[in-house]
Amino acid sequence: MPFKPVAEAFASMERITSRTQLTLLLTRLFKSTPPGAIGIVVYLIQGKLGPDWKGLPELGVGEKLLVKAIALAYKATEERVERLYKSVGDLGSVAERLSREYRSRAARAVTLEAFMAGGGEALTVRRVYNTLYRIAMAQGEGSRDIKLRLLAGLLADAEPVEAKYIVRFVEGRLRVGVGDATVLDALAMAFGGGAHARPVIERAYNLRADLGYIAEVVAREGVDALRGVKPQVGVPIRPMLAERGRDPAEILRKVGGRAVVEYKYDGERAQIHKKDGEVYIYSRRLENITRMFPDVVEMARKGLKAGEAIVEGEIVAVDPDNYEIQPFQVLMQRKRKHDIHRVMREVPVAVFLFDALYVDGEDLTSKPLPERRRRLKEIVVETPLWRLAESIETSDPEELWTFFLKAIEEGAEGVMVKAVHRDSVYTAGVRGWLWVKLKRDYKSEMMDTVDLVVVGAFYGRGKRGGKLSSLLMAAYDPDRDVFPTVCKVATGFTDEELDRMNEMLKKHIIPRKHPRVESRIEPDVWVEPALVAEILGAELTLSPMHTCCLNTVRPGVGISIRFPRFIRWRDDKSPEDATTTHELLEMYKRQLRRVEEPAEQV
């Protein structure tokens, strides 16, 4: 399949703000894509070479090398490329302009670089992908020159619009405004006959978190082929998500009256896969984090009595002397890429297991929670550092509250309340009332922290002048696949955290508002939705400045957080895992009820 129609689709997507129109455009693109190429097209739309859990290396092409490649491809000087970049602010547009200016496919000479990348023929989707893959896989001595030749050759053969989006892909700034939810909608329209097919496609994706694979199966064999998709060891399952609650009696009513209540540990949620002697560990974001936890690998080898298993648990840092639970920040030292065995000794961990999703060929995701817990108990060999999560089963709000206080006292951040009725299946990738989290009271009107996405930033004044020192934060609206703003956060940062924040933001700054962001506020810099932070505030309030739940409570206003304060970064969460607009609306309504209750009693 030629790459040009894909690049032209990217150009159209960039101009479209309506999710409906985006879905229709994607539907047309998918229908015109051969089944053998559709997986690659989906990966390119996602801006990646494959699912995160595969752990493929990054392309490793910095800005300077990209400038060199553009200059080499179009016989321009690097100084000219840099001048244009400073003027335009986008290397993709620079490549498009130079390609149009210096090349046409009929007149282009075959350079050494073009020969290295394939010889001057029209670009195909597969050639673009394969070349980008080769660039990523080029490692070690001489890899910089290999990357330069491959990329310059690809750009030399690219038409202007193709060059623009190849460069943006390499930069990691594709910016076409399409999330996974929109891709699923389009696959349902293209190959399932309409929206009624989406639940089947989405469930398959939730069980086999590889959107390219799902697209290829549905394109080749139809929606019915996806009904048979089951968990597979080595392929992470998208995690089941919980709603949040505050009142024990209300929570028990929501889950059906009786529930299992477990400690909610302040650590890294982990999905642990075992097949024979091999063990893989995946984060909440489905990233392969096996390297960080060689001790957990050994625990799983010895502590799971099954040939094949997929279990879920929480990895927490513990005190090496007494095994008491340590704060989440201590665990984050495990993210170091070097000296992991030394860090392992300094920061030992414990694993608290709470679910079994697959055991020896049996898919347990369709089984109710009591059966999954029974299977988990059967296969786990407990030790002080590898054990089942602390839990009770109850229908009594008082007992739930007492257990909650005990959890807080013992270092947990709250409890998870889980339904036990016959429909208490594992709803992969779905947030619902089968699980409800009850977290600690932070002694403020806003009873819980929220996880919000950075979409913009502002420069500070005084001693913080010249540095980005406050953030524009957004929630996630899953119905529309967008990020409406909630608040501006300027407090809670230490000087060290500000320095780290500025480094983190560098690679995510973009020249204009991201297509999936809704904002009435113009920050000093726009940031692509990628970073998630935990925020605590005094209360939820109505705001004419923010777009979260706009026009929902009252015309013309949204919901905002008063006196927001930064708590910590949530590296374990993707933007789509952030607190949703539905959750914020529910929190606001509960807050109103608390305020109104005393007046009603008078």
Curated annotation (Swiss-Prot):
InterPro entries: ATP-dep_DNA_ligase (IPR050191), DNA_ligae_ATP-dep_bac/arc (IPR022865), DNA_ligase_ATP-dep (IPR000977), DNA_ligase_ATP-dep_C (IPR012309), DNA_ligase_ATP-dep_cent (IPR012310), DNA_ligase_ATP-dep_CS (IPR016059), DNA_ligase_ATP-dep_N (IPR012308), DNA_ligase_N_sf (IPR036599). Optimum pH is 7.5. One of its GO terms (biological process) is DNA repair. Pfam families: DNA_ligase_A_C, DNA_ligase_A_M, DNA_ligase_A_N. CDD domains: Adenylation_DNA_ligase_Arch_LigB, OBF_DNA_ligase_I. Optimum temperature is 70 degrees Celsius. One of its GO terms (molecular function) is metal ion binding. Inhibited in the presence of 100 mM KCl, NaCl or NH(4)Cl. ATP binds at E262, R269, R284, E314, F354, R431, K437. The active site is at K264 (n6-amp-lysine intermediate). It catalyses: ATP + (deoxyribonucleotide)n-3'-hydroxyl + 5'-phospho-(deoxyribonucleotide)m = (deoxyribonucleotide)n+m + AMP + diphosphate; ADP + (deoxyribonucleotide)n-3'-hydroxyl + 5'-phospho-(deoxyribonucleotide)m = (deoxyribonucleotide)n+m + AMP + phosphate; GTP + (deoxyribonucleotide)n-3'-hydroxyl + 5'-phospho-(deoxyribonucleotide)m = (deoxyribonucleotide)n+m + GMP + diphosphate. Its cofactor is Mg(2+); Mn(2+). Less active with Ca(2+) or Co(2+). Not active with Cu(2+), Zn(2+), Sr(2+) or Ni(2+). NCBIfam families: dnl1. Belongs to the ATP-dependent DNA ligase family. DNA ligase that seals nicks in double-stranded DNA during DNA replication, DNA recombination and DNA repair. Can also use ADP, but not NAD(+). Monomer. This is DNA ligase. The lineage of its organism: Archaea, Thermoproteota, Thermoprotei, Desulfurococcales, Desulfurococcaceae.
